[in-house]
Amino acid sequence: MLRGLIDRFVGRGDWAITVPPMDGALRPNQMLEEAHVAAEARAPDNLILHHGEVVFSSGRELRKLETGAVVRSFDRPIACVAAADGRLAVGLTGAEVTVFEPDGAVTPLPVAQSSCPTALAFLDDSLIVCRGSTQYAADQWKHDLMESGIARQGSGSVVLFPRDGAPRLIADQLRWPFGVLPVGDRIVVSESWAHRLISLDPRGAVRPKPVLSDLPGYPARLAPASDGAAWLSVFAPRSQLIEFVLREDGYRRRMVSEIDADYWIAPALANGRSFLEPIQGGALKQMGVLKPWAPSRSYGLVIKLNGGFEPTLSLHSRADGSRHGTTSVVENSGTVFVASKGGDVILAMPVEELVEQ
């Protein structure tokens, strides 16, 4: 307790507002901003492979990337999707997860263990469900962050649903798990508000183990790469201003109660759409130009990870770009596809043209 008080007074440890720099493999570039647009859609979110085709969620619809044809539509916005061996799992905002079988059978999962779904993945015959929070819906991620501040524990969890059998809790007290990827005998999960990736035991017998910590942004969904590595999307950047606000409980509570969420000093999927948005002095346009290194609440970032989950390559859309809010990535037939939810586009880049740093 005494150490915590001292850390708070001198601004160190959990109370430090420093943000790790983007250098080395995370050195900024314009690769997302210069990438080919594979499709334009309203707030494209979760990219997956289904029956060998790339499909994506957009609002209440699940669409094919190549043709734009609607695969399925729902009465609520889609929060997350996953597919394997003809099976399709869909999590809806403010509702539960439903599994659609190849034979036409439809299986809704228990609401108590599948509410607020943020990411899904199949593991053999089982389905892994990431629950972002017990208090908020999937589209209220900003509320969850502002409510928790820098708390060490959250209300998120990861639950395993066997095809036949009772659901099993793998991990709880997580800070907004937003991505999941089975890797061998473990499950790797992105924990957004903790800025890290953690490794979980599918049996829940071992405590979560960090595999990549102190990321410069808020990690989102994971996807396998063709070379056995992985892709990680980062949907928003960290900043010293936001880190400061997260530590000022009184200010943050008043901001949340009095100001619309779009105008909070908080991470965002897009920026510069309204004059009411908060802005730092370094983000003011000079001679009509916004510098790419200006402080921004939104950003576009995709990271390539090696087998040890170390960054080897990164793709960026910087402060002066528009392809921000990168919530999902998938690789198919030598091309990597990126969903820019804030930029309303899906981008495509040949893998062979991406040079690791």
Identify the residue ranges that each predicted region occupies.
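Asp-box/WD-like beta-propeller blade repeats and closely related beta-sheet repeat scaffolds
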Residues: 91-98, 102-123, 130-156
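Short loop/turn segments that connect beta-strands within beta-propeller blades
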Residues: 65-68, 101-105, 161-165, 201-205, ...
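A short beta-strand motif characteristic of beta-propeller blades
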Residues: 32-39, 67-73, 105-111, 166-171, ...
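Short, conserved, GDST-rich strand-edge loop motifs in beta-rich repeat architectures
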Residues: 130-152, 235-297
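Beta-rich, blade/repeat-based domains predominating
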Residues: 39-51, 74-87, 112-125, 155-157, ...
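Conserved beta-strand positions in repeat-built beta-propeller and related beta-rich domains
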Residues: 50-60, 89-95, 129-142, 188-194, ...
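Blade-level signature of beta-propeller repeat domains, shared across WD40, Kelch, NHL, RCC1
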Residues: 237, 325-357
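A short helix->beta-strand "capping" segment at the edge of beta-propeller domains
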Residues: 2-4, 11-43, 65-69, 304-318
